[in-house]
Amino acid sequence: MLRKAVIMLGASLTLACGAFAVGVVPSGADSGSHCSFQHVPNLSPGVSYNSTSGTFTDPGGGTVDCKGAVSGSGDYTDSGTYSNATCQSGGTAEGDPTFTINGQTFTDHVKIVFGKEPPHFPKGLVRATFEGAKVKGTIDLMPTKGDCISSPVTQIKGMGEFDMK
């Protein structure tokens, strides 16, 4: 039961954070680029057993690596909102990630849904899917602050990948 709660909490957080990290796509970029990313966003007020809505922000330090029409490594920041998030049932999120690769900045607005696919251990306890006008991908989330039992999850590590449309 505890494992399921932690997984759902992670999924909720992943959704919130995944939208930011995965949703960034270079405007006008040619399709055919595949990217991987990771980041550690903060959730406020956090996710618990009670349904909550809030915001997520990435304090920086996230990385992205792309191959294809857009190729290279860089960093990103993101922010957004999450809704109806609980440790046991996921939720949804929206975010506006921004990536900079080789001096070029890319942005997109993405919608995230937690729990549509099974988690991929050891990357995360929860998997979310996300899609924007320019990108489509998945993110695996793992709580790094909070456990959804004695305290809400207020930070998660997200690791994912996306394809540019």
Where do the language-model regions lie?
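Predominantly extracellular/secreted and cell-surface proteins with exposed
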Residues: P41-K134
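A short, structural micro-pattern
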Residues: L9, L13-T14, C35, T154-I156
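Secretory targeting and sorting signals
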Residues: M1-P26
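Short N-terminal segments immediately surrounding and downstream of signal-peptide cleavage
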Residues: S27-P45
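Extracellularly exposed regions in secreted/surface proteins, prominently low-complexity, repeat-rich
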Residues: E131-K165
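Compositionally biased, intrinsically disordered low-complexity segments
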Residues: L9-G10, V25-S27, Q104, H109, ...
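Extracellular secreted precursors and ectodomains with disulfide-bonded cysteine-rich loops/domains
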Residues: S33, V64, N84-A85, K145-D147
